[in-house]
Amino acid sequence: MALFLLAVGGSYGTSQAQEDYRMFEAKTPQLDSAYAKGVSGHIAGELRPGLLVMAGGCNFPDRPARKGGAKRYYSEIYIGEYLGAVHHACETKASEVDIWWWLIGHLPQPTAYAAFQQYDDQLIVAGGQSAEGDLRDAYIIQLGNRHGMTITPLPSLPEPRSGMASALIENVLYLIGGRVNGKLSNTVLSLDLSRPQKEWCEETPYPHSPFLKLVAMTNQDESDTSSGVPYLSVMGSFTGVDEPDQGVQADVTYMTYTPQTKQWQTYKIAPDDPIAAHGFGGGYASGGEASFSGGVRADLFVTALQREKDLKAAKAKGNRRLVKKLQAEQRAYLSHDPAWYGFCSDWYSFDKSRGRGEAKSGFHFDGRADAVYLDRSSSMMDGMLIGGETMPGVRTPRIVIFTTACNPRKFHVTTDPNYQ
């Protein structure tokens, strides 16, 4: 029978003053030497209090990306108990937390960049990417007894998809954009998890050319005052990636979708808006605070994406001189220190009434892309940032945890009779 230490009392969001928090560092699973180097595009959630699940992801374990290393995809599913270690660190005033990880199973195949959402005590996973290409799989991950787990299939996606944004409204999972059959798409799918035997439904596509690396969240607690129903918030940034007759550009755009009316509303981000420099491509959202963070700097990433596009075209035309030039530029781009890339570390929200973004005061992490962020609505902690990239091609195994519940009197011990 497992013991869990539960934090009780008030909880705070990203607007709370940073000095009110205690911050701890931990590591993602270190049981495999390649996975131990850190991954991005992984799956993670807290399916029981104080018990993390982490699965899949990808990295360059043998040789860095800037030196032409091969990307490796992972299928391992790990669980880790962290809450007792946080309690101990609070008592000893330590800054590091030792999470006890176990390997409990494998995904149906090595997977990165899948859409996933925590749904009660389950993780819903859809699509993703493997070394062989994009995936159609959809399934439920659920923990069992004695470090066991089950994977229950859901209806397969209509076509292979990866890199989608996702969000839940009540029992319905939404998949927004991503790559469909290898090409960026603005299509949207939904699946009613209360009736999973049904097939995926097509929703209204978002009204924009396809974005790369969207970020989405549900405004469950901030319903649209005009309709009184929850809606999806979506942030997009990079377009023109696949279109042969267009250049890549950062067209940072905030969009909302109300499933009840099947309608989108688009808000163009002005160049002087504080969020225009970010775009949050590869970033993450906090549903509890309706805010965005993380991801790449817009101007630098546009140049890198255009270079990749030009390199592909030069190879197709057999222009060796241009290929050599672009490859040299690409290596130079990947050789800077992490700080140079300016991954976003602050939190921003979008005020629909003013049509502008605004910075939110309070706690911020180091900037990362393709990481997993758990807020207080999905974790016993006030915030947790897991893995991801610190610069293009470079992953980190670091987990950053912050909490306001560091007074030992705010913890109590309960038992989970179903977990041994």
Which residues are covered by each model-predicted region?
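Sec/Tat signal peptide C-region and signal peptidase I cleavage site
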Residues: 12-16
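Bacterial N-terminal signal peptides
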Residues: 1-9
